[in-house]
Amino acid sequence: ELLKRILEKKRRFISPFFYNVLMKKIGLILIIFTIIGCSNQESLDVESANKQGILLLDNGTEPQGLDPHIVTGVTEHKIIIALFEGLTMQNPQGEGIIPGAAESWNISGNGKEILFRIRDDAVWSNGDPLTAEDFVYSWRRILTPALGSKYPDMLYAVKNAEEYNKGLIKNFDQVGVEAIDKKVLKVTLRTKTPFFLKQLAHYATYPVHPKTIEKFGGISNRDSQWTRPANMISNGPFTLTEWSINKVIKVTKNERYWDSDNLKLNGIHFLPIDNESTADRYYRSGKTHNLNIIQTEKISKYQDEFPEEFKLEKYFGTYYYRINTDIFPLNNIKVRKALSLSLIHI
């Protein structure tokens, strides 16, 4: 503004053409400085984040979505478990599961019926109580054929769940899930399934807020806007406050969460860093608290430089080569056998 006043006073000594060009350039410079200023305000380093109780997390790629009944990726999983909570959860201290939204459960003698007691203080982020009926609705949603979920089989151990998902039966009342009262959920399995409680820690079985789902298109709408920050209502330890595509997803401590007193973090910033070199640079320069994947050639270096921080975790996966057997020389079975013999089989 001051610069503009000075130029206005000197305007009679400047040609109109040069004056207009100069004003446009000044405007462009101001826009650039504004953008840089906003960018700097939004960025945090580890030192600043520590003071605010915020975790800066290298989360790999940009998530495809945040609907627990539709997405399938590891990237999405990390965010969803911060926003939602199922009946059980993975034990962060080791193997097995621990109570989540359900404070306890009773298994019948034949192992086919389970009664889950949902916590009295378990509520949604808007204050609505979390009920057994919310789980009935949510499981009906993931099993609804029109939704096209990729993980409906996570509930196939439930009586008639597979049949409903495949359209063999139309009445969901025949599926083995029932709200006995507001806080008691009865699940009937097709047969004794020892690993079922562990399956319930998977985000595909998590509850969604029925009123919100209905508000934004209904139970089978895949393109719903309910996962936007302004719309999402969740039941986990954090709530969604910002989703800037390809930049950051921010979640903030949910003060209504039943175990909020034990939450050490005030928030998490999930950063989509899909380049290993960039991730390495971010970690070393103090822009993230973690490094998701270490480049193979740098593993020993990190073990030496960061012996306390370095963690080598097991990862179960399937790795394979798919080859075109119609082209030379791969159309020769002897060549393919030779390739097979050259590989290390685990």
Question: What is the meaning of each model-derived region?
Answer:
Residues 39-41:
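Bacterial signal peptide processing site
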Residues 58-109, 231-234:
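N-terminal lobe/hinge region of extracytoplasmic solute-binding protein
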Residues 61-77, 101, 128, 144, ...:
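A structural "hinge/loop" feature
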Residues 91-92, 172, 189-263, 267, ...:
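Gly/Pro-rich hinge or "lid" segments in bacterial periplasmic/extracellular proteins
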Residues 103-151, 186, 282, 329-331:
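Aromatic- and charge-enriched surface segment that lines or borders ligand/interaction sites
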Residues 117, 136, 147-214:
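Surface-exposed binding/hinge segments that line
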Residues 131-138, 182-188, 236-237, 265-267, ...:
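Alpha-helical secondary-structure segments
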Residues 241-252, 269-329, 337-338:
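Extracellular/periplasmic solute-recognition and catalytic clefts
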